[in-house]
Amino acid sequence: MDYVLITFASTYGAIYAQKLLAPVAPVQVMPVLREVSLGCGMAVRLHPEDLPAVRAAMAGSQLKPEEYAFYAVTGTGETLQAHRIT
């Protein structure tokens, strides 16, 4: 896995997560890959090694689990693969 994306059902969720996660791990808000969109068009990108701390922070947040999803992303362009992490 090259990086992890968190996708969101709403723009509010993406902005909220960016603020929530800033003290936990370096994150970047970016346009979501259409292969993994939950609807709002924004995602938070993070390093795979930060996933456990980020998951813990998200689990303790006001966002409901159905409002966001984690994806493992590998490759770029035509070789890009994204798989949901459960």
Model-flagged regions — what are they?
Residues Y3-T7:
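Short glycine-/aliphatic-rich beta-strand segments at the starts of folded cytosolic domains
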Residues A9-T11, K19-A22, P26-A56:
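Amphipathic, hydrophobic secondary-structure cores in small proteins
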Residues P52-T86:
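C-terminal structural segments of small proteins and small subunits
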